[in-house]
């Protein structure tokens, strides 16, 4: 039996370390503490595991916060920043990360069209940029074990 030829990791239709990027949006203390659809410790463990895997596979990572500079909201939870040491947090003032020029520029700079997307909350901070990215020709893959909303209905957009 002959093996199939090695797949091109950049052009492959499946996710590979060479064709995908991880987007982490708004994992800040107020957002984490407001969720009711998942245990907080489970959520934090899951997003940290996703970040560790992304680092292990050398995926480009875009890390974003909302209103840290504008209104003094706390930055990304320390459990994530410890794993993502050296990755700059891009702070925005809009709910939809895709409406922030610096965020979109960072995503485009990865050169990847497959976006593994995580965000708090599903119903806004995940859904809005995911829909905009899809409209611009990106493929979006939400990590359902690391995204949550403010209510049990957060699963509907997924």
Language-model features: locations:
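Short coil/turn segments at beta-strand junctions that form active-site/ligand-binding loops
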Residues: 19, 59, 111-114, 138
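Glycine-rich oxoanion-binding loops at beta->alpha junctions
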Residues: 89-111
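A contiguous pocket-lining binding segment that forms or flanks enzyme active sites
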Residues: 113-158
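Short, catalytically relevant binding-site loops at active-site mouths
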Residues: 68-70, 95-98, 122-124, 148-149
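Active-site acidic carboxylates
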Residues: 1-94, 142, 156-157
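Glycine-rich phosphate-binding loop at the start of an alpha helix
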Residues: 48, 74, 101, 123-127
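Short, well-ordered alpha-helices that flank and scaffold nucleotide-derived cofactor binding pockets
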Residues: 82, 105, 131, 135
